[in-house]
């Protein structure tokens, strides 16, 4: 078992908190010391109470799903003898309302573009199988109920 931590910090910067007129900007600090400016998505909380330049939880969720899938995929490619030179994913999440009318990210679409080199290059079928295994072994995917699909990259 391992434990993973993040420190989330928010401070009131205006006197209008009780009127709902307050910034939702905050920071995420990770165990390696990296601090990331965060904010709700402007599609959820409009400016000036959000900051579109900051990472929002919805983007971070999509990035976590994509990153975990990629890391498992790279491990599997190596184990199967496929040399990966680059892996770029244009992942996207879709926010909808569930049956109770509550917003959630109902789907994440991964769209990886993977470049290989060497004598052994995977077939389309090999790639599909590696993506299937990566999804099965990704602990983030195993922790969520969101539908995750993989589309062909460009």
Question: Which residue ranges define each predicted feature?
Answer:
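Extended beta-strand/beta-hairpin segments
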Residues: 1-63, 74-154
